């Protein structure tokens, strides 16, 4: 028996002891450490990734006064204390400003700066994520993931201990398998330190989505692939790997790892079952990927050059030193399954009944005779009463429908123009005919919550959860509480985004 085989068996036995002793006691990074490939970065807004970790998981900043607070686990190794966030963010909006590194290396993720591409915020920075866009439960306890709309990104260009050059590393992420698009590039992992494209092989990151510009897998996607810079790779070929399946899990575990002329993609349902290997073998046959030229920055939600058109949801993920064994990763997957990720409610406040006709009354002082209505494709507010014309009363009435993109939220169909729905486009609200596309469904899905000013409901965009129905100069937008658009002004924001829902005029 070779010494290498003995060591492998010893590690497998040790991992088995860790896993069988208590999945609750051993977090993912404890398991990686036992396997000889310790975490050098560990990020999660939902739970601690070490059994002994009690520090901050993430920081939120509220819109009302700009103050911040850290969210820690309920107990060592436990689930995030979502109640602290809910209390701190009550009656206002909150953004996730920092995702802390639990490894002790200080590899925290913060708002991504501009690079080859500018972000949509001031000075070319990317957007920060809403703190409430991705509620879940872990073992029945509420927590929040990181729901990332196009334009949202986090980064650390001065990371410590991450792989550079052709050095070995591993990584995993737990993602929402139903939240993706085809834009570049929803990534988590190793990237350039300059925010620019410095050539083939300068990245090694998990990618999730259905982009087909470079590589692809079986079916129509989405797929787990690796962003190695100037290519999303599903295997040896720079085009297609039929062994990389389309994913349909609500919660997905995505794994990428790489060492000298060897790399792998693995994946699983994060709520049940075990990991499958979608590719394991030599580096891509295209030039520049053997050896690799990794730079060691860390990105989330964007490409290495700050390409920021993608969308996705991140719950937890780590990066390791060294190439983890399949056995180690299998034990990590068992721990993720034991965390029992499950969906949580996306709505709150007064309930809206699917199939009912409603009208939405402005609550801003001086404008309370106005209701949400439309004039052709323009969604606006108009003065409406029971004595208004039939046409106007119909224009100010909306049929509540199950959310076109997410059945946990709602869509609003025009009473006087059946088949047409309120949707956002360039952050203006429009009335457009349902064209049956994924983009339209996402643009037309909204999640009501308790009104920010204490009255009625505020209606949050599902696809841009920092943004709410807001009347501004009597026209409707999806607006954020502060931002670069004129309609993002903070003045009277809570009132302008709060609506009293009543039985429809028609």
Swiss-Prot record:
UniProt signal peptide: 1-26
UniProt induction comment: Repressed by glucose.
Reactions the enzyme catalyzes: Hydrolysis of terminal non-reducing alpha-L-arabinofuranoside residues in alpha-L-arabinosides
Activity under varying temperature: Optimum temperature is 60 degrees Celsius.
Annotated stretches, region: Catalytic: 27-343
Assigned keywords, A-Z: Carbohydrate metabolism, Disulfide bond, Glycoprotein, Glycosidase, Hydrolase, Polysaccharide degradation, Secreted, Signal, Xylan degradation
Annotated stretches, region: ABD: 344-506
GO biological process: arabinan catabolic process; arabinose metabolic process; L-arabinose metabolic process; pectin catabolic process; xylan catabolic process
Glycan attachment points: 91
Entry EC no(s): 3.2.1.55
Cystine crosslinks: 29-39, 89-94, 184-185, 409-447
Entry keyword Hydrolase: yes
Site residues (Cis-peptide bond), renumbered to this chain: 184-185
Residues the entry annotates as binding substrate: 227, 230, 304, 424, 426-427, 443, 471, 473, 476, 496
Pathway where this protein functions: Glycan metabolism; L-arabinan degradation
Source superkingdom: Eukaryota
Assigned protein family: Belongs to the glycosyl hydrolase 54 family.
Protein's job: Alpha-L-arabinofuranosidase involved in the degradation of arabinoxylan, a major component of plant hemicellulose. Able to hydrolyze 1,5-, 1,3- and 1,2-alpha-linkages not only in L-arabinofuranosyl oligosaccharides, but also in polysaccharides containing terminal non-reducing L-arabinofuranoses in side chains, like L-arabinan, arabinogalactan and arabinoxylan.
Protein name in UniProt: Alpha-L-arabinofuranosidase B
Organism field: Aspergillus oryzae (strain ATCC 42149 / RIB 40) (Yellow koji mold)
Gene name of the encoded protein: abfB
């Amino acid at each position: 028996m070779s010494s290498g085989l003995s060591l492998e068996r010893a590690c497998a036995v040790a991992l088995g002891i860790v896993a069988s002793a208590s999945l609750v006691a051993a977090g993912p990074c404890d398991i990686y450490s036992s396997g000889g490939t310790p975490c050098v970065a560990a990020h999660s807004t939902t739970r601690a990734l070490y059994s002994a970790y009690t520090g901050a998981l993430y920081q939120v900043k509220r819109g009302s006064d700009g103050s911040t607070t850290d969210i820690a686990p309920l107990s060592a190794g436990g689930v995030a204390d979502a109640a602290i966030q809910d209390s701190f963010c009550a009656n206002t909006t909150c953004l996730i400003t920092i995702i802390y590194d639990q490894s002790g290396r200080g590899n925290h993720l913060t708002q991504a700066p501009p690079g080859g591409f500018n972000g949509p915020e001031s000075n070319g920075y990317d957007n920060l994520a809403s703190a409430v866009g991705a509620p879940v439960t872990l073992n029945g306890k509420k927590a929040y993931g990181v729901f990332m709309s196009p334009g949202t990104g986090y980064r650390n260009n001065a990371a410590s201990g991450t792989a550079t050059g052709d050095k070995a590393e591993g990584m995993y992420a737990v993602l929402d398998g139903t939240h993706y698009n085809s834009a570049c590039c929803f990534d988590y992992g190793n990237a350039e330190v300059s925010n620019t494209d410095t050539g083939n092989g300068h990245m090694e990151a998990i990618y999730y989505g259905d982009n087909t510009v470079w590589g692809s897998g079986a079916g129509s996607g989405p797929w787990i692939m690796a962003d190695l810079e100037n290519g999303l790779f599903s295997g040896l070929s720079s085009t297609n790997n039929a062994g990389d399946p389309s994913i349909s899990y609500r919660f997905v575990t995505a794994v990428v790892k790489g060492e000298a002329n060897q790399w792998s993609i693995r994946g699983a349902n994060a709520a049940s079952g075990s990991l499958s290997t979608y590719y394991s073998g030599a580096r891509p046959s295209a030039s520049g990927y053997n050896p690799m030229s990794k730079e060691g920055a860390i990105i989330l939600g964007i490409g290495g050059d700050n390409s920021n058109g993608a969308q996705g949801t991140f719950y937890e993920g780590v990066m390791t030193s060294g190439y983890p064994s399949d056995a180690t990763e299998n034990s990590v997957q068992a721990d993720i399954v034991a965390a029992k990720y499950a969906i949580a409610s996306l709505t709150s406040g007064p309930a809206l009944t699917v199939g009912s006709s409603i009208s939405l009354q402005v609550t801003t002082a001086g404008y309370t005779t106005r209701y949400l209505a439309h004039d052709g494709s323009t969604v606006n507010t108009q003065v409406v009463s029971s004595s208004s014309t039939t046409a106007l009363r119909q224009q100010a009435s909306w049929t509540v429908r199950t959310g076109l993109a997410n059945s946990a939220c709602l869509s609003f169909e025009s009473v006087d123009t059946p088949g047409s729905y309120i949707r956002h486009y360039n952050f203006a609200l429009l009335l457009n005919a349902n064209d049956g596309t994924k983009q339209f469904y996402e643009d037309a899905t909204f999640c009501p919550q308790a009104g920010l000013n204490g009255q009625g409901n505020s209606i949050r965009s599902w696809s841009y959860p920092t943004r709410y129905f807001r009347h501004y100069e009597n026209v409707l937008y999806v607006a954020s509480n502060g931002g670069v658009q004129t309609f993002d002004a903070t003045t009277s924001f809570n009132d302008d985004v709060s609506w009293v829902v009543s039985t429809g005029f028609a």
